Amino acid sequence: MINDIKKDAETRMEKCVEAFRNHISKIRTGRASPSILDGIMVDYYGSATPLRQLASVTVEDSRTLKINVFDRSIGAAVEKAIMTSDLGLNPSSAGSDIRVPLPALTEERRKDLIKVVRGEAEQGRVSVRNVRRDANDKLKALLKDKEISEDDDRRAQEDVQKMTDIFIKKVDAALADKETELMDF
């Protein structure tokens, strides 16, 4: 029973860290990455469709993405979707390919992005702590119902705390990597 609670907490904490990593991977660093365009939805015959389903996105060089649209007739719609996104990108057509040059980030913009990333990291830490609180509440309920002893409860809470510390360190490590990546250019 205690092991189930700990395993559940570990799984949920891992998901919190993964969600944080996925979220910050979409923050533009000046270096080309196909994940930058993950949130782009294209109007494809009247329905909003993710760009990934309509084209392949590859890195041409460190500052340029190349989009190869599967259906040439929607090239203009793909360009429009990228231009109207809040990414500040200006795509250009070159035959069947669309090239998306990424402008260099200014120092001020980098500092703003670092603030955003730090805020996201704090959200990640809060999520991990919420999972800890839920696990501790479940343990206290078992103790109250006399299904586990006080010693078992204390040991399990210590294990959950150790797990929490490990996952918060993972969030901090991902934050440090992203900050370094943002300031490297």
From Swiss-Prot:
Keywords of the record: Cytoplasm, Protein biosynthesis
Pfam families associated with the record: RRF
MF (Gene Ontology): ribosomal large subunit binding
Protein localization: Cytoplasm
GO cellular-component term (any): cytosol
CDD domains referenced in this protein's UniProt entry, alphabetically: RRF
HAMAP family attached to this UniProt entry: RRF
Family assignment from sequence similarity: Belongs to the RRF family.
General function of this protein: Responsible for the release of ribosomes from messenger RNA at the termination of protein biosynthesis. May increase the efficiency of translation by recycling ribosomes from one round of translation to another.
Designated name of the protein: Ribosome-recycling factor
Organism encoding this protein: Erwinia tasmaniensis (strain DSM 17950 / CFBP 7177 / CIP 109463 / NCPPB 4357 / Et1/99)
